């Protein structure tokens, strides 16, 4: 079968690249460039990716980091991504970095570091997923206020954070069910999606609201059934007029002066 043959070829190439970091990097760059073209061909204007990680292993500041380590890491990250960003620009597609633990772009400050190193490349955008913010105790609502111009993709995923005297953000290597921070099915967690949808609508977000499900308790079938309805119930139909338009009697300079007692 052609698909089996193709899959076999992929596995062989993966083994080859696994032993050759340079070839692996070249292959990965080519895949992203192809993804830019594929997105254009599909009529998409945004594509999601992870940033990768040079300095994530040093996210905790002890042992003390050498001066310049973080700066050098982000310079190299931007150096590798800039040609790819240029390719996405040629194809008219934004590249949205999912702000995610394990990646160098894991919060607002790291996103800003990267953006600066790319010289504010116009295709550097963001995928917004509040579940990754609540688990690190980042204010996911004010994040929208700050970065709404960059948010072009949206994962609708719920989560909860219930710290105890035994574990907090780091989780103590516990299984998902026993972690203080864990992903939940939509509506079962702590995330304020009414406020999120309101803010995104307020700022004119016109991308997809994509259901992402990773609950450690509920079945995926139930999560999908409930989640699709949850999203539909939260999507806001934007009003074309203000609530008090009915009271507008018009205005002119003479009328305004009369109201102010200047006539």
Q: Can you say where each PLM-predicted feature lies in the sequence?
A:
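C-terminal helical cap(s) of enzyme catalytic domains, especially alpha/beta-barrels
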Residues: 220-240
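Short amphipathic alpha-helices and their capping/turn segments at secondary-structure boundaries
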Residues: 30-46, 139-152, 194-202
């Amino acid at each position: 079968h052609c698909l089996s043959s193709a899959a076999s070829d992929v596995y062989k190439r993966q083994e080859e690249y696994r032993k050759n970091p340079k070839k692996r990097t070249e292959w990965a760059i080519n895949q992203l460039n192809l993804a830019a073209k594929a997105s254009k061909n599909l009529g998409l204007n945004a594509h999601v990716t992870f940033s990768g990680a040079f300095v994530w292993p040093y996210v905790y500041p002890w042992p003390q980091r050498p001066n310049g380590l973080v700066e050098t890491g982000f310079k190299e990250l931007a150096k590798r991504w800039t040609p790819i960003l240029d390719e996405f620009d040629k194809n008219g597609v934004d590249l949205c970095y999912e702000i995610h633990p394990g990646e160098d772009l894991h919060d607002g400050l790291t996103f800003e570091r990267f953006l600066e190193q790319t010289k504010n490349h116009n295709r550097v955008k963001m995928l917004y997923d509040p579940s990754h913010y609540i688990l690190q105790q980042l204010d996911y609502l004010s994040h929208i206020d700050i970065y709404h111009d960059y948010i072009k993709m949206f994962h609708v995923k719920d989560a909860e954070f219930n710290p105890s005297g035994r574990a907090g953000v780091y989780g103590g290597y516990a299984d998902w069910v026993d972690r203080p921070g864990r992903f939940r099915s939509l509506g079962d967690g702590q995330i304020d999606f009414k406020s999120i949808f309101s803010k995104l609508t307020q700022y004119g977000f016109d991308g997809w609201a994509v259901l992402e499900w990773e609950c450690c308790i509920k079945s995926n079938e139930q999560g999908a059934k409930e989640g699709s309805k949850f999203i539909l119930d939260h999507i806001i139909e934007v009003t074309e007029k203000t609530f008090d338009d009915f009271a507008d009697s018009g205005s002119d300079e003479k009328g305004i002066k009369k109201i102010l007692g200047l006539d």
